[in-house]
Curated annotation (Swiss-Prot):
Designated gene of the protein: E1
Highest taxon of the lineage: Viruses
Enzyme class: isomerase
Catalytic activity: Couples ATP hydrolysis with the unwinding of duplex DNA by translocating in the 3'-5' direction; ATP + H2O = ADP + phosphate + H(+)
Localisation: Host nucleus
Originating organism: Human papillomavirus 40
Motif (Nuclear localization signal): 87-89
GO molecular function, one term: DNA helicase activity
Annotated protein name in UniProt: Replication protein E1
A cellular component term, taken from the record's GO annotations: host cell nucleus
Length: 647
């Protein structure tokens, strides 16, 4: 039976689908023979072949013929890509050092710039440079060399992706200035990039000190002295601030000069931005923490970009640096120049340098009553602003030796002066150094303690004269009756010495009696009474005796008038019978009175004791020859004079 040109069966016999499968044996892409009739092809159902995708090669078509296998492969690739992104986001070792820095002022002025900030992961950086480098698998197997760089916006701030999508917008990509020429990449670094590299330094202060010397030609340490503590206060401060925004720098001097007596500022530009160097004298003293906090807020910079130290006050090169810098056009100066700059830069001051004179220093210490080494050193150094000899003392390298010599000479002068005076002259000399008070509180206290004033004055007169057997007075009584207060106030007025039985184990515990006008032994106990009964009978008599002195030979002295206080009344104990004739005893039986505010009812001070001795000078026989003649003694002078030498 001849083949029919078409199919009339309803799909039971040969069909168009059967014809397609029959033609599968032919190679795909073979050209159709021209001998075949186009009409036969259309009738055979070959017009349906356009429904099959022949764009894939035969091998791939065979492998992906299974639709479920293709879906599995696509899901696996998608999961691997997501896992790679997560690894790059959370396992990246790179952490930006700027992420914790304070925001720039540009971020406060522009919301769009505020949204652009540097992230902590490497994910955004790789996404940002996917145009200039090939994307690898994320496992480091790619052989393509890539370059990782920090990218910045046109405003100098670091750029990062915003949101969680990790995509870079078109506007942000336009802000990146990157030109790739083969393997060489050109990047235009802004001041913010330089600060990022600065923060990566291990020793930030060393980097800042080096940059300062590069900009100004002098080390920061040459202009300042070091304060180890941040709590130390000072009125003068030198500070250098790095990476300041130029818009803030314009009004800084105007804002700060309201708080300062003197302000010297100069700005310098570098690759890190604007650098500020300033010398400021505040109206009140400030510590370093306060100054750093103030500058950080005013200039909008982190604390670690600020160097703050007090200036060198005794350095002529440092003073000359500020003097010359203030004369230039690059500095802005307001206020009165500090005296330490003016004195070290004036020609008159340089020519007027004098040689130190120990005699002038000794005379000053004697006139002001300084005998302690610490007081002499401290107060004389403060006179360097008004005394040329004190300024020469500060410039000397032998300050400690001069202080020791000065204190030693003052003690010798004072001791000789005291020994030359009689007791009446000494009391008058001490009274001239204090004000006039009221003698009545002392008399009222003695009456309050039931002491006969006439008997007490008679004993006090003999005590001051140092009459043998009358050279020691003891005040006894219960605790809190005012015995020590009464005795200590008298010793303070007469500048007497205090000895203590606690030092009795030393051979030199009585050495201070050799250089005293009067002396006091407070709170004599039973053991001390026993020691005095055994070893100090001759001393209590007021007769000459010998005492041991440290690093000196034995000295024969007459014991000065000695005042004792004790809770033990030796007149009521027979075992102290040998001391009863040597000690005059007065008893304080009543507690010392105080008012409702806790103040003493009977005030005992130098002014009241001065009035007491002046009032009762005739009864105590304290009249001096100078009082009768009306002569006034002049203060001694210990300075070299002009001696006329004759031929």
């Amino acid at each position: 039976m001849a083949d029919s040109p078409g199919t009339e069966d309803g799909g039971a016999g040969c069909s168009g689908w059967f014809v397609v499968e029959a033609v599968v044996d032919k190679q795909t892409g073979d050209a159709v023979s021209e001998d075949e009739d186009e009409e036969d092809i259309e009738d055979s159902g070959f017009d349906m072949i356009d429904f099959i995708d022949n764009s894939v090669v035969a091998e791939e078509h065979v492998e992906l013929s299974n639709a479920q296998a293709l879906l599995h492969v696509q899901q696996t690739c998608a999961d691997a890509a997501d896992l790679c992104e997560l690894k790059r986001k959370y396992i990246s070792p790179y952490v930006s050092p700027i992420q914790y820095s304070e925001p720039s002022i540009d971020g406060d002025l522009s919301p769009r710039l505020h949204a652009i900030r540097l992230g902590g992961g490497q994910k955004a950086k790789r996404r940002l440079f996917q145009r200039v480098e090939q994307r690898d698998s994320g496992y480091g197997y790619s052989e393509v060399e890539t370059t990782e760089r920090q990218v910045e916006t046109e405003h100098g701030g670091p750029e990062d992706t915003v949101g969680g999508s990790g995509r870079v917008t078109t506007d942000e990509a336009e802000a990146v200035e990157v030109v790739e020429d083969g393997s060489h990449v050109i990047d235009h670094c802004s001041p913010r990039t330089q600060l990022i590299e600065l923060f990566k330094c291990k020793d930030l202060n060393a980097k800042l000190y080096g940059k300062f010397k590069e900009l100004y030609g002098v080390g920061f340490g040459d202009l300042v002295r070091q304060f180890k503590s941040d709590k130390s206060t000072c009125t003068d401060w030198v500070y250098a601030v790095f990476g300041v925004n130029p818009t803030i720098a314009e009004g800084f001097h105007t804002l700060l000069k309201r708080q300062a007596l003197y302000l010297h500022t100069q700005w310098t530009s570098c690759k890190w931005g604007m650098v500020l160097l300033a010398l400021c004298r505040y109206k009140v003293g400030k510590n370093r923490e306060t100054v750093v906090r103030q500058l950080s807020k005013m200039l909008n910079v982190p604390d670690n970009q600020i160097l703050v130290q007090p200036p060198k006050l005794q350095s002529p090169p440092a003073a000359l640096f500020w003097f010359r810098a203030g004369m230039g056009n690059g500095s802005e100066v307001s206020g009165t120049t500090p005296e330490w700059i003016a004195k070290q830069t004036m020609l008159e001051h340089s020519f007027a340098d004098t040689q130190f004179s120990l005699t002038d220093m000794v005379q000053w210490a004697y006139d002001n009553g300084h005998t302690d080494e610490c007081e002499i050193a401290y107060y004389y150094a403060q006179r360097a602003d008004v005394d040329a000899n004190a300024a020469a003392f500060l410039k000397s390298n032998n300050q400690a030796k001069y202080v020791r010599d000065c204190a030693s000479m003052c003690k010798h002068y004072r001791l000789a002066e005291m020994r030359r005076m009689s007791m009446a002259e000494w009391i008058k000399h001490r009274g001239e150094k204090c004000d006039e008070g009221d003698w009545k509180p002392i008399v009222k206290l003695l009456r309050y303690q039931h002491i006969d004033i006439i008997v007490f004055l008679a004993a006090l007169k003999k005590w001051l004269q140092g009459i043998p057997k009358k050279n020691c007075i003891c005040i006894v009584g219960p605790p809190d009756t005012g015995k020590s207060c009464f005795g200590m106030s008298l010793m303070h007025f007469m500048q007497g010495t205090i000895i203590s039985y606690v030092n009795s184990c030393s051979h030199f515990w009585l050495q201070s009696l050799a250089d005293a006008k009067v002396a006091m032994l407070d709170d004599v106990t039973a053991a001390c009474w026993g020691y005095m009964d055994t070893h100090m009978r001759n001393l209590l008599d007021g007769n000459p005796t010998s005492i041991d002195r440290k690093h000196k030979p034995l000295a024969v002295i007459k014991c000065p008038p000695l005042l004792l206080t004790s809770n033990i009344n030796i007149t009521q104990d027979s075992k102290y019978q040998y001391l009863q004739s040597r000690v005059q005893v007065f008893e304080f039986p009543n507690p010392f009175p105080f008012d409702s505010n806790g103040n003493a009812v009977y005030e005992l001070n130098d002014a009241n004791w001065n009035s007491f001795f002046k009032r009762l000078a005739s009864s105590l026989e304290l009249q001096t020859p100078g009082d009768e003649d009306g002569e006034s003694s002049q203060a001694p002078r210990f300075v070299p004079g002009t001696v006329v030498r004759t031929v």
